[in-house]
């Protein structure tokens, strides 16, 4: 594979199916990174939106089926699987969440399974889904990315939803005054009222940075790990197009080895996202700083 072809192949697989306003004023799909960039902020990554919604519906369908078929007698395979998942997540919540809220465990379960499903799409060979999109659309140049968590828009959206819950529960539990005091009266304090007033800007700067870092680090951690994993799969796929038998053979070995290792990564990243969400919401429920 020539360097230009390999470079184009990689860029094509790292570009989202973007819909927005083209430079000529019409609306349509971007066929290059330059066109996608020219669309500006109001552009939609339809592949990210479509796959995230579809996998969310699959999650709901599977768990609904398990709930409808649940029995107190001999459980089936699906019921066993769902019960194991629920017990695992419920145990994680009990160990890490010290407040009282009926929504934390269902939220944690939703996050873990949904993120895991979005991550798991990365195990599908990199050319299969893009080629299917080309076959359906009839456009040989249309890009398509199936792994929603390799799009920072998706991970940031999920993280800022968690951030909104952090703010909501902080104000609900501590009150608006308590929340503002948490941001302005810590970590530095003084019994002298004038010194305390002088410390408010410093405290606010430190606490605000700490607060806003939570969703950003939550999003970028998931995005960075999944993006790197996808890039490795793409680079391995380039080996298959090299035309060299030994390099293609090495690609087969690396593909299987990385896929097996990646199963651990996709599970671990879903678990980390879930656990950090639980910990952050637990901190929001604490009365004291």
Swiss-Prot record:
It is a multi-pass membrane protein. Pfam families: ATP-synt_A. The chain crosses the membrane at residues 43-63, 103-123, 160-180, 193-213, 232-252, 259-279. GO terms for cellular component: plasma membrane; proton-transporting ATP synthase complex. The keyword Ion transport applies. One of its GO terms (biological process) is proton motive force-driven plasma membrane ATP synthesis. The keyword Mitochondrion does not apply. It is found in: Cell inner membrane. PROSITE patterns: ATPASE_A. F-type ATPases have 2 components, CF(1) - the catalytic core - and CF(0) - the membrane proton channel. CF(1) has five subunits: alpha(3), beta(3), gamma(1), delta(1), epsilon(1). CF(0) has three main subunits: a(1), b(2) and c(9-12). The alpha and beta chains form an alternating ring which encloses part of the gamma chain. CF(1) is attached to CF(0) by a central stalk formed by the gamma and epsilon chains, while a peripheral stalk is formed by the delta and b chains. Belongs to the ATPase A chain family. Key component of the proton channel; it plays a direct role in the translocation of protons across the membrane. This is ATP synthase subunit a. It comes from Pseudomonas putida (strain ATCC 700007 / DSM 6899 / JCM 31910 / BCRC 17059 / LMG 24140 / F1).
């Amino acid at each position: 594979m020539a360097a230009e072809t390999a470079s184009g192949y990689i860029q094509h697989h790292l570009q989202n199916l973007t819909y927005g306003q083209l430079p000529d004023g019409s609306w349509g799909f971007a066929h290059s990174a330059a066109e996608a960039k020219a669309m500006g902020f109001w552009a939609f990554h339809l592949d990210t939106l479509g796959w995230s919604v579809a996998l969310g519906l699959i999650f709901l369908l599977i768990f609904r089926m398990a709930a409808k078929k649940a029995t107190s007698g001999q459980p089936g395979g699906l019921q066993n699987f769902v019960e194991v998942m629920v017990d695992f997540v419920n145990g994680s919540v009990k160990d890490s969440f010290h407040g009282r809220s009926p929504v934390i465990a269902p939220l944690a379960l939703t996050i873990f399974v949904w993120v895991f499903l979005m991550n798991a799409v990365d195990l599908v060979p990199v050319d299969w889904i893009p080629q299917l999109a080309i076959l359906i659309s009839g456009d040989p140049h249309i890009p398509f990315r199936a792994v929603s968590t390799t799009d920072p828009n998706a991970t940031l959206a999920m993280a800022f939803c968690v951030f909104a819950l952090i703010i909501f529960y902080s104000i609900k539990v501590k009150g608006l005054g308590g929340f503002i005091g948490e941001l302005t009266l810590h970590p530095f304090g003084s019994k002298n009222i004038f010194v305390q007033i002088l410390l408010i800007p410093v405290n606010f700067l430190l606490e605000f940075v700490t607060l806003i870092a939570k969703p950003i680090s939550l999003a970028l951690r998931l995005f960075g790990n999944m993006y790197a994993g996808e890039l490795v799969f793409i680079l391995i796929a380039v080996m298959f197009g090299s035309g060299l038998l030994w390099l293609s053979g090495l690609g087969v070995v690396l593909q299987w080895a990385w896929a097996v290792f990646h199963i651990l990564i996709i599970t671990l990243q879903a678990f980390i996202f879930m656990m950090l969400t639980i910990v952050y919401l637990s901190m929001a429920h604490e009365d004291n700083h």
